[in-house]
A protein has these predicted regions:
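Short N-terminal helix/helix-N-cap motif within the alpha/beta-hydrolase-1
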Residues: 33-41, 60-63, 98-99, 125, ...
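Catalytic active-site module of serine/aspartate enzymes centered on a nucleophile-bearing elbow/loop
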Residues: 240-286
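Conserved HGGG/HGGXW glycine-rich cap/lid loop of the alpha/beta-hydrolase fold
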Residues: 13-60
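Flexible "cap/lid" loop of the alpha/beta hydrolase fold
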Residues: 101, 105, 112-149
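N-terminal cap/lid segment of alpha/beta-hydrolase-fold proteins
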Residues: 1-11
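Conserved loop-alpha-helix segment in the C-terminal half of the alpha/beta-hydrolase fold
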Residues: 211-252
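Active-site loop/oxyanion-hole signature of alpha/beta-hydrolase fold enzymes
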Residues: 45, 52-91, 95, 121, ...
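Conserved alpha/beta-hydrolase catalytic His-Asp/Glu region
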Residues: 125-126, 148-208
Length: 286
């Protein structure tokens, strides 16, 4: 069931399905809740109530927000959890991985776990050596993202996606067309450009404040980093000792939940069982 939650003069669209403990899904920039099309039915079948969110400015959520930072998105996610009734585990990809971190730090009473998929969760340093060495992958992806950041280039974003999804799902041609059509809607490319200009430093500053378990999943072929596994280890190092776990999926890029959904589910379902089911006492809301 699609709901619209009022937030600061805008609306956040949330598609809720299933019954059971609450799992909130938040996609990355330039995308929509359709990004989780392979995970939602499996999570529902496993006995979870799934709230699949269109983050601000994307999908069926409104555009024209004053800000698109991870802190802004985190406030929306906490509002979703409180509206639906927690506790919840929040799954966030890319920019929403950082937002999920902030949400967990801000609302430990209702967020009991975080899954970060290919997350931008800490301030980035430019790896010149990796940039020069990895010319066919990391370097190419960075160049396309710079086109989006500097000029709001839709062709640049589509070229980036072709690199960022090295393991193409069977519906990739249709999915790529869907994304392109969505970004041609008025104001949507401006939202994407604004998101590329945000810094993950706000999320990195809150890693030490997180008190719930965190699972970081990196794609080994993610073009956003010269060494994706090293980025994951840095996130864990900034969390309180013992809270974080890292998994790297070989061959996956920046969208492991669409490229390798079975592998992601094999990691996420046990995590949910440990961090959510045992703490949930009821309160399902259809």
């Amino acid at each position: 069931m699609l709901e619209h939650i009022e937030r600061d003069g805008g609306t956040i669209a949330v598609d809720v399905s299933g019954t059971g403990p609450l799992v909130v899904l938040a996609h990355g920039m330039g995308d929509s809740r359709h990004s989780y099309r392979f995970l939602v039915p499996e999570l529902v079948a496993a006995g979870y109530r799934v709230a699949n969110v269109d983050i601000r400015g994307c999908g069926d959520s409104s555009a024209g927000w004053a800000g698109y930072s991870r802190t802004d998105i985190a406030e929306d996610l906490v509002a979703v959890v409180r509206h639906l009734g927690g506790p919840a585990v929040v799954v966030g990809q890319s920019i929403s991985g950082g937002a999920a971190t902030i949400a967990a730090a801000d609302a430990p009473d209702v967020i009991t776990g975080v899954v970060e998929l290919a997350p931008f969760t800490r301030a980035q340093s430019f790896d010149l050596g990796g940039f020069l060495r990895n010319q066919n992958h990391h370097r190419s992806g960075t160049v396309q993202l710079l086109r989006v950041m500097a000029a709001g280039s839709l062709p640049g974003w589509l070229a980036y996606l072709d690199l960022a999804v090295p393991t193409k799902p069977s519906d990739w041609a249709a999915e790529r067309s869907r994304i392109e059509d969505a970004l041609r809607r008025p104001g949507r490319m401006a939202v994407l450009q604004a998101m590329t200009k945000t810094t993950p430093a706000d999320a990195g500053a809150r890693l030490a404040d997180v008190r719930c378990p965190v699972l970081v999943v990196q794609g080994g072929a993610d073009p956003d980093w010269a060494d994706p596994a090293a980025e994951g280890r840095r996130i864990l190092a900034d969390l309180p000792t013992g809270l974080g776990d890292l998994a790297v999926i070989d061959g996956a890029g920046h969208y492991p939940h669409t490229e390798t959904p079975a592998e992601v589910l094999a990691l996420v379902l046990p995590f949910l069982g440990r961090t959510l089911t045992a703490t949930t006492t009821g309160g399902d809301r259809a």
